[in-house]
Amino acid sequence: MPKLNRCAIAIFTILSAISSPTLLANINEPSGEAADIISQVADSHAIKYYNAADWQAEDNALPSLAELRDLVINQQKRVLVDFSQISDAEGQAEMQAQFRKAYGVGFANQFIVITEHKGELLFTPFDQAEEVDPQLLEAPRTARLLARSGFASPAPANSETNTLPHVAFYISVNRAISDEECTFNNSWLWKNEKGSRPFCKDANISLIYRVNLERSLQYGIVGSATPDAKIVRISLDDDSTGAGIHLNDQLGYRQFGASYTTLDAYFREWSTDAIAQDYRFVFNASNNKAQILKTFPVDNINEKFERKEVSGFELGVTGGVEVSGDGPKAKLEARASYTQSRWLTYNTQDYRIERNAKNAQAVSFTWNRQQYATAESLLNRSTDALWVNTYPVDVNRISPLSYASFVPKMDVIYKASATETGSTDFIIDSSVNIRPIYNGAYKHYYVVGAHQSYHGFEDTPRRRITKSASFTVDWDHPVFTGGRPVNLQLASFNNRCIQVDAQGRLAANTCDSQQSAQSFIYDQLGRYVSASNTKLCLDGEALDALQPCNQNLTQRWEWRKGTDELTNVYSGESLGHDKQTGELGLYASSNDAVSLRTITAYTDVFNAQESSPILGYTQGKMNQQRVGQDHRLYVRAGAAIDALGSASDLLVGGNGGSLSSVDLSGVKSITATSGDFQYGGQQLVALTFTYQDGRQQTVGSKAYVTNAHEDRFDLPAAAKITQLKIWSDDWLVKGVQFDLN
């Protein structure tokens, strides 16, 4: 199977995209190209196939994001979504739009593979079977271990989640650069005689862009207030980047000579393997709904610039329960500001960074070669006696950045109006301008003697290789309201909540905190906006179905202070429900048949979850495990922490140290010790668990570390550790993060 080009979109939805409440449906057997793809997979039992044509039926809707995450992350299944079986273009576009609405990001492709990547969803769109590697659908080893243990691993949280409602995902841009694309003439002087060769080895583009979809609410005084806008942030920062752009592991050369006798002419030539004349990255929005708000770098950067910079952006946020004592009864409004930072480490070496903003929608960053930019400048000698035969190029003048695993850093923030609707396509082009290096020796003959001079050739070919990635943002997505969804529970029933169906009709159904159909945003105007469709609102004039949102007072609601009564601003009456049927209505008072009590609580369709900071370092491979029913952490430790896991057969890390376990019940605080390890590198060397009753248990050792640093995490009251994220290599554990219920 050849190495294939693909654009993989990795979504780790910290605030989940909204989707249908229907449970995972039984989908037909695959056919056509989908069957060909699955037939190449060794274990097809790990694959869940969805024919999007079946989703056109009203009773067979898309799985919700929570259900999809459970299937892919917890059960470690591979999902293949097939749009190719929809025969008409209009129907296909409609289902692709439904997909975008359900999961927060959309693609105009025939197929989408959905897999797990670093504990999150990875979306890989493609159009033909030969564009995808069947290995992508193979179940990983961890899936077999988790299946045997019965453990699941719910979606992870992010430190931004507790403060900032947002959807975040990764775009993995992968493109192999073929030998043909990097093939040039062996000789510039004797093109037709010396043949050609690939000037690259294992060349590829492999970058991971981080994307955030979020809302900033206006907060603060005029002149320094946070923007009131919908935000799309695209970053290549220190926490993403990928493997980089690679042309060669090292630079080699070949020597060629003239095939005829020369007197006063070029007689010898060297061709050196390819380097990058420039690297270019272009960001573009497809329409004027989105405009560039901020970029980093903000200006051009000279060569030999080496510094770690922070790109910060301040947003206005609701602040959550900590700021408002009203909790889920609080209207959506900015009560705090939050600075979202990205660290960008620069070491430009031979290159100058040139920023070019063509208009409000497009900006490009070009790493343009400035130091030793010509073949002539790479020469380490100018003349020699004629009998000297030596390679005249000093390849040490070419930094590895020019050909091996170049990783750029940049940050682009787009804004849209707070009232913007519709959608925008965002396109990212990542490219490298490949050039071979040609140098020649010229024989100078002057009867009584001769010598040679060295030269570089600049009128030589360049070849730009580009990989494009795109994603579509739906401006009507509920994350752009900036609020946390809530439900409305009918208090005369033990377990009934207001639920909306696909036609907007309202009914009472069993409460489910993960259903978007039972979730609403209580907005600035006091309207209850459906999280399933942000264009529909609860209207006191028509309580059998949601109505298009407008400025009518019948759509505005207030909570009567000190009660569980939700009153309509226009009529002054309270929302009530029939105690037998759950039918909604407005009433001045309750009676034997009608209750006015309505309970509201936050729903977790946005999957907000609290986590500890990362204790230690985010080096090595990240592994995510759910804590088992015994609530224990299993450890192998000695001079440092060798391995961690939620079970003795799920340990990740090295094989050293002795095995023990830690009781995670009743933990009050966790202190991590890290620093310069006596046996090499910066390591996490010890974890100390302090319990509610004052007991302490330490795993690892502090005896073999210098320049020690301690980080302490205090667990909130009644919080339980439910999940682990562990960073490790084959020797030691590097870092750990604890997720709470």
UniProtKB/Swiss-Prot annotation:
Q: What is its main location?
A: secreted
PTMs per UniProt: Proteolytical cleavage is required to convert the 80 kDa hemolysin precursor into the active 65 kDa hemolysin.
Effect after changing residue 453 to F? In strain: N16961
A GO molecular-function descriptor:
toxin activity
Query: What kind of membrane protein is this, topologically?
Result: Multi-pass membrane protein
Q: Does the record's keyword annotation contain Transmembrane? A: yes
The compartments listed are:
Secreted; Host cell membrane
**A biological process from GO:** cytolysis in another organism
Instruction: Detail the disulphide connectivity of this chain as listed in its UniProt entry.
Output: 182-200, 497-511, 537-549
- Tell me the segments the record calls region Beta-prism domain: 607-741
Q: Which residues form the propeptide?
A: 26-157
Source organism's superkingdom? Bacteria
Where does the UniProt annotation place the signal sequence? 1-25
Induction line: By hemolysin B cytoplasmic protein.
Q: Which terms in the GO cellular component ontology are assigned?
A: extracellular region; host cell plasma membrane; membrane
Alphabetically list the UniProt keywords.
Cytolysis, Disulfide bond, Hemolysis, Host cell membrane, Host membrane, Lectin, Membrane, Secreted, Signal, Toxin, Transmembrane, Transmembrane beta strand, Virulence
According to its record, what is known about the domains?
May bind to glycans on target cells via the C-terminal beta-prism domain.
Hey, which family's this protein in? Belongs to the HlyA hemolysin family.
Self-association state and partner proteins as the record states: Monomer. Homoheptamer. After binding to target membranes the protein assembles into a heptameric pre-pore complex. Proteolytic cleavage triggers a conformation change that is required for membrane insertion and pore formation.
Q: What is this protein called?
A: Hemolysin
